Amino acid sequence: MTSVSGCGSVSLITNRSAFLGNGLQHRAVFLKPWSSSSLQSRSMVVEAKTKTSSEDRIARHSRIRKKVNGTTERPRLCVFRSNKHLYVQVIDDTKMHTLASASTKQKPISEEFDYTSGPTIEVAKKVGEVIAKSCLEKGITKVAFDRGGYPYHGRIEALAAAAREHGLQF
């Protein structure tokens, strides 16, 4: 139980606590008198966000990785998207091995599409088709989809849809 007594600029705070024993604790607190300058409204300062969007994506990806694990029977299909390229890997997390991979840097995809502004939805569909064919050749039919913290729309959605159309089960 805390009580405040005093007048003017000095107050005495008495604290009786059973947690600290039955003794009383006193401490003096010096209070400032009200001034007109402290009551004036202050201008609102808008501060920048502390995290960037890429840091937010990495945080989302770490939360996803806690839930999505690749096994030998059902490896993880991991997607990484940069401004210029799109990368996909099928990973067995128990053995820490990459079983299959596809990217826009591979010759069949890069020669077929002449893109200068980065991967488009059509390019993402082609990468999904290539990874699905590569997985089916190696006997992998079921995968756990790891979108890498990216929203499930646009290139990520097109890649997943193309992989499903060509035989991969998510």
Curated annotation (Swiss-Prot):
Plastid keyword on record: yes
CDD domains per UniProt: Ribosomal_L18_L5e
GO cellular component terms given for this protein: chloroplast; chloroplast envelope; chloroplast stroma; cytoplasm; nucleolus; nucleus; ribonucleoprotein complex; ribosome
GO biological process, one term: translation
InterPro entries: Ribosomal_uL18_bac-type, Ribosomal_uL18_bac/euk
UniProt cross-references to Gene3D superfamilies, sorted A to Z: 3.30.420.100
Any one GO molecular function term: structural constituent of ribosome
Cellular localization per UniProt: Plastid, Chloroplast
Key words of the record: Chloroplast, Plastid, Ribonucleoprotein, Ribosomal protein, RNA-binding, rRNA-binding, Transit peptide
PANTHER family: 39S RIBOSOMAL PROTEIN L18, MITOCHONDRIAL, LARGE RIBOSOMAL SUBUNIT PROTEIN UL18M
Subunit structure: Part of the 50S ribosomal subunit; contacts the 5S rRNA.
Protein's name according to its UniProt entry: Large ribosomal subunit protein uL18c
